[in-house]
Amino acid sequence: NGELLAWVSVGPLVDFYWPWKRAGALGEIAKSTAGIVCFTLAPSQRGKGQQREILEALKPYGREQGWTAIEAYPFDPSALEKHKEHVIWPGLTKGFVDAGFKRTEAHWLSNPEAERSIYRFEL
């Protein structure tokens, strides 16, 4: 019916402007590390496991691209209470955890409550 169901922006960290600090911290492996910098689902698709399905599909795609890892920078669900639906664009932690991503550290832009973290999946 032409409805947009999801949108994901993913690619090598070195191809994106805003994670330059993260790419610098990773050094040479940043070239083979992909970052999911945006991830959103249409309201009609939320709560149905779609985030996990998309993340699972990114794994073989990432291997085909030669990536060695995929990182994401989602918000903790507690951020929804504070910021309402304006924080959904990078995704929520539950979908990444369900897809096997592991929290590595607090996000460099996050506040002290760490409502946003870095999650990583090694390919």
Predicted feature locations:
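Conserved beta-strand edge residues that scaffold enzyme active sites
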Residues: 2, 76-77, 110
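Conserved acetyl-CoA-binding loop-helix of GNAT-fold acetyltransferases
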Residues: 38-41, 47-63
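Conserved acyl-donor/pantetheine-binding loop and adjacent beta-alpha core of acyl/acetyltransferases
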Residues: 3-38, 83-89
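Generic structural signal for helix capping and beta-alpha/helix-loop junctions
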Residues: 17, 79-80, 113
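Short coil/turn motifs at secondary-structure junctions
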Residues: 13-15, 44, 77
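C-terminal "cap" of GNAT-fold acetyltransferases
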Residues: 88-99, 105-123
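Conserved GNAT acetyl-CoA-binding A-motif
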Residues: 62-87
